[in-house]
């Protein structure tokens, strides 16, 4: 399992906000479209924190 920390773009605040930490089996890459919590997101950035052994995912909701 890979640990991911999800940050979702908040248009009102104009910044990424922490959402939650999840475990997922597959590797997720920048530019990929994912489904999470019944919503569609585009992965706009991926940052691997080697110290914490987690991957930060920065997501923007796909309104299409």
Regions found by a protein language model. Give the residues of each.
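Short, basic/aromatic beta-hairpin or loop at an interaction surface
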Residues: 1-17
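Short acidic DE-rich linear segments
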Residues: 1-2, 61-64
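Short alpha-helix capping/helix-loop boundary micro-motifs
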Residues: 17-23
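Short, well-ordered loop/turn sites that connect or cap secondary structure elements
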Residues: 27-28
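Short beta-strand-centered aromatic/proline hotspots
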Residues: 39-48
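Short, solvent-exposed secondary-structure boundary/capping segments
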Residues: 50-60
């Amino acid at each position: 399992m890979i640990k991911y920390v999800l940050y979702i773009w908040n248009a009102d605040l104009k910044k990424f906000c922490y959402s939650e930490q999840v475990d997922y089996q597959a590797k997720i890459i920048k530019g990929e479209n994912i489904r999470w919590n019944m919503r569609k997101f585009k992965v706009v950035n991926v940052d691997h924190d080697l110290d914490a052994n987690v991957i930060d995912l920065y997501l923007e909701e796909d309104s299409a």
